[in-house]
Regions:
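Extreme N-terminus nucleophile/cap motif
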Residues: 1-63
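Short acidic (Asp/Glu) patches
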Residues: 57-69, 83-106
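Structural motif
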Residues: 77-79, 108-109
Length: 114
């Protein structure tokens, strides 16, 4: 039985806000260049009770937005990113993670693998 590729996640939690440009760049390369994860990408930057969420249903390795965020992404205490390898259906924004829900006046963001 061979190894099956799955989606990949990157998360960072820090006491102080930091930039994740280098880590985002490394993950983005796996999103269609060094890896098969070409079916979408997303990143969430948290700031207190708010979240800044970006997603695209296209390869992260080819995204001008990813390149921009690698240099200009906001420093954050908490970052969650995901690159998608579709196992069902075509790439679509509604299937691109992280997902966001607002409950009780607070943004909740999640991503999963499988």
């Amino acid at each position: 039985m061979g190894v099956r590729a799955v989606c990949e996640l990157f998360a960072m939690s820090s006491r102080y806000p930091i930039s994740v440009g280098f880590s985002l760049e490394t993950l983005a390369r796996r999103g269609g260049h060094n890896g098969p994860h070409k079916d979408g990408w997303g990143v969430a930057y948290f700031e207190e009770r708010d979240v800044f969420l970006l997603r695209e249903p296209s390869p992260a390795a080819e995204s001008d937005l990813v390149r921009f965020m690698e240099v200009n992404g906001p420093p954050s205490n908490l970052v969650l990113s995901h690159i998608r390898l579709a196992t069902q259906g075509e790439p679509a924004l509604c299937k691109t993670q992280p997902f966001q829900r607002d409950l009780g006046g607070q943004a909740h963001v999640f991503a999963h693998n499988g």
